[in-house]
């Protein structure tokens, strides 16, 4: 009995050669639409599916293969009872289904209007793929051109058929997830930002050497059609990105962009292990880098740096003496790229991509599941800062408090930041007590604490941080407030002549 293959693909990579190889082995090839035309024009012997079903394609191609002659031929078990039923209807078996789906993701990604996107939701394709995958013991299902050679083997093992079936179901499930994400995103009235069921469409975009540590495999995945500034950045110089490089660069860029939105100058952010270690604003990138570097010359070694403005030759040269893992910027001039490639060949130099379609959700892994929340993107302008002390902050202190507040939001809790004149002078992050974070920040600042401001991402349970800050020369403090001992904390600030501002907004980061 002649074997039959149904081929209907949007991605026509290698399909002509594949179909020609099948016919050379005695297969009959069935096809539809554009695939039929492509095979026919290439001189491949091919039969139109409508000749098998006895019905023409309908509704502008929306109905082509949704017919018992197709699905019966795919789903029939290769046993007498099913085969006799096919024969009674005049249907034959279909032994191979080669289908990949309408380019839905690509249509969304290029910003097509909604009617065009909807038209690129494939119906017949997923139905055939799922039918073939269900009956994989008798039908080969191919959704990836890389698997075409498998079908040309004399025998295909049961385990290989099962692998192809699993791949097929993954293909359709990812496709459905992309459609779900689009329709939910396009809806003006979502029932909730955190639905009862959350479908996540992830596909791998980068394979890294390993994860956080050499014994952990690692990779980078895209969520739906989102484009990320780091994930999709152009690497213009240096080595391939590592897992930790991606994480740190994303943390640095996130803080850099938040500060750039509220500051007038060029912003530079240095990050180590996802925590800021030097942050500064200045008139130009070179000056901002030098201020951020000098904020903590020890910690910036081996760090990741993000800047808010283009990096030119002068800024590049200023980085000569510091070992860095990654530099990310909105633009890097050609002479700077050339200099980095020659003088710092191991430094990964990235031009950030324009972010789009980014989820508002922040997803954290748990054993057996995930904890999901909305990202903390609250801007300063959403706050209602309240001065709770007799002494009011000066204009410069207000500017520094705002700068320190944005920075401390991006540090791991417990966190305290000291800043003065648009640069961090002391940071304490990841501490298990508030006072320890403050002690670390003060020690980091040294004499630079004199005249600085202090910001904390959460309230003070006691007045110890206020007393330490005042003793170190800090003149203004910003914190959320809301502790039981707020009156004692305020009294200590008044006693010591320190300004204190409550924001009413906590910013834990774990």
From Swiss-Prot:
Residues 1-143 form the MGS-like domain. The keyword Hydrolase applies. Keywords: Hydrolase, Multifunctional enzyme, Purine biosynthesis, Transferase. One of its GO terms (biological process) is 'de novo' IMP biosynthetic process. Its EC number is 2.1.2.3, 3.5.4.10. PROSITE patterns: MGS. The keyword Ubl conjugation does not apply. One of its GO terms (molecular function) is IMP cyclohydrolase activity. SMART domains: AICARFT_IMPCHas, MGS. One of its GO terms (cellular component) is cytosol. CDD domains: IMPCH (cd01421). It catalyses: (6R)-10-formyltetrahydrofolate + 5-amino-1-(5-phospho-beta-D-ribosyl)imidazole-4-carboxamide = 5-formamido-1-(5-phospho-D-ribosyl)imidazole-4-carboxamide + (6S)-5,6,7,8-tetrahydrofolate; IMP + H2O = 5-formamido-1-(5-phospho-D-ribosyl)imidazole-4-carboxamide. The IMP cyclohydrolase activity resides in the N-terminal region. This is Bifunctional purine biosynthesis protein PurH. It comes from Deinococcus deserti (strain DSM 17065 / CIP 109153 / LMG 22923 / VCD115).
């Amino acid at each position: 009995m002649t074997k039959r293959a149904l081929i209907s693909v949007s991605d026509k990579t290698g399909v002509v050669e594949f179909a020609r190889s099948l016919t050379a082995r005695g297969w009959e090839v069935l096809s539809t639409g554009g695939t039929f035309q492509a095979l026919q024009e290439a001189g491949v012997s091919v039969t139109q599916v409508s000749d098998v079903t006895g019905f023409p394609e309908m509704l502008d191609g929306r109905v082509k293969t949704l017919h018992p002659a197709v699905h019966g031929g795919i789903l029939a078990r290769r046993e007498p009872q099913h085969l006799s039923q096919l024969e009674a209807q005049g249907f034959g078996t279909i032994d191979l289904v080669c289908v990949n789906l309408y380019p839905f993701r690509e249509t969304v990604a290029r910003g097509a209007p909604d009617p065009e996107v909807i038209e690129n939701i494939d119906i017949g394709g997923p139905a055939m793929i799922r039918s073939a995958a269900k009956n994989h013991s008798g039908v080969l299902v191919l959704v990836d051109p890389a698997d075409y050679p498998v079908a040309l083997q004399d025998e295909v093992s049961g385990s290989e058929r099962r692998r192809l079936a699993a791949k097929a179901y993954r293909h359709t499930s990812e496709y459905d997830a992309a459609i779900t994400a689009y329709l939910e995103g396009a809806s003006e009235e979502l029932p909730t930002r955190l639905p009862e069921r959350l479908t996540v469409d992830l596909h791998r975009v980068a394979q890294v050497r390993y994860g956080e540590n050499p014994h952990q495999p690692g990779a980078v995945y895209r969520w739906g059609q989102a484009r990320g500034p780091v994930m999709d950045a152009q690497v213009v110089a240096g080595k391939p990105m590592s897992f930790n490089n991606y994480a740190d660069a994303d943390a640095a860029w996130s803080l850099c962009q938040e500060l750039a939105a509220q500051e007038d100058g060029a912003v530079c952010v240095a990050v180590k292990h996802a925590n800021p270690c030097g942050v500064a604003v200045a008139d130009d990138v070179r000056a901002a880098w030098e201020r951020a570097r000098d904020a903590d010359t020890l910690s910036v070694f081996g760090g990741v740096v993000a800047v808010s403005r283009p990096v030119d030759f002068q800024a590049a040269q200023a980085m000569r003496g510091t070992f860095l893992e990654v530099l990310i910027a909105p633009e890097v001039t050609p002479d700077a790229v050339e200099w980095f490639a020659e003088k710092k060949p191991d430094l990964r130099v990235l031009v950030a991509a324009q972010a789009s379609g980014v989820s508002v959700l922040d997803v954290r892994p748990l054993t057996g599941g995930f904890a999901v929340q909305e990202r903390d993107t609250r801007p300063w302008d959403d706050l209602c800062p309240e001065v709770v002390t007799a002494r009011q902050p000066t204009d410069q202190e207000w500017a520094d408090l705002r700068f320190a507040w944005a920075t401390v939001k991006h540090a791991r809790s417990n966190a305290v930041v000291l800043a003065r004149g648009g640069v961090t002078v002391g940071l304490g992050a990841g501490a298990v007590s508030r006072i320890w974070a403050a002690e670390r920040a003060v020690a980091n600042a040294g004499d630079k604490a004199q005249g600085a401001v202090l910001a904390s991402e959460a309230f003070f349970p006691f007045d110890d941080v206020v007393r330490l800050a005042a003793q170190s020369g800090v003149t203004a403090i910003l914190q959320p407030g809301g502790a039981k001992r707020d009156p004692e904390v305020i009294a200590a600030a008044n006693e010591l002549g320190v300004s204190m501002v409550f924001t009413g907004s906590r910013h834990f980061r774990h």
